[in-house]
Amino acid sequence: MNHSSPTGSFRAVLLDLDGTLMDTIPDIAAAANAMRVDLGLSMLHVDIIRSFVGKGTDNLIMRALSHDLGSEMVTPDLFEKGRAAFYPHYHEVNGQHSVVYPGVREGLRLLMDRGLKLGVVTNKPTEFTLPLLRQAGLLQNMQAVVCGDTLPRRKPLPDPMLHACDMLNVAPTETVAIGDSINDALSARAAGCAVLAVPYGYNEGLDVQDLDVDAIVSDIEEAAQWIVSRLP
């Protein structure tokens, strides 16, 4: 459960993308269902696909294929066919129906006004992340972007958080990570960052109240207020 709130000289904030900065489920679900139709499978409800998000695109593809087939039926050949179908479908719809969550722009502005460095740490591949952030007008605010294919290991391992801290030239103890899922919380905790969670994201269908975080905040604007209230 929640730790006591840390205090100190925070210098950087690392934000998750899907389910934290933006609601990307409409586009992800459209691409996943188009992939399934290509492979002769029926479409899944968007709420089912929402529970697949968090551990990267390959995991999403595997779960979208194995949902009714069973993982033992998803052969390497079928997985590669799914991957070959999903990527172009997602490129086609990426950003079409995704929206920036309320409070995000206000929160980022508050953090920037107080001189904090900003970065994105996501399990989403670079080829989808950068166009999406650019289209949403968020990329220009980010001094570091670490994607699911930037390093050999992704969240929930600490590597992406540590790499982002290195890029921003800050220590993990000077950094707050904000996310919506257990992957964000585990990665940030292992890296030594403070952790905030928003309750409106995906978290693979799990209750955000069960996450090991310093606080659950209603949105990014409240997260920013939490952070700046602890600055010297």
Predicted regions and their residues:
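Asp-based, Mg2+/Mn2+-dependent phosphohydrolase catalytic module
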Residues: 1-12, 47, 112, 125-126, ...
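Active-site neighborhood of HAD-like aspartate-dependent phosphohydrolases
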Residues: 2-51
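Short, acidic loop-to-helix structural element flanking the phosphoryl-transfer center
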Residues: 8-9, 88-120, 126-130, 158
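A general structural signal for well-ordered alpha-helical segments in protein cores
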Residues: 28-29, 57-61, 79, 83, ...
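Short helix-capping segments at alpha-helix termini
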Residues: 37-42, 69-74, 113-114, 137-141, ...
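A metal-dependent, Asp-based hydrolase signature
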Residues: 55-92, 102-105, 110
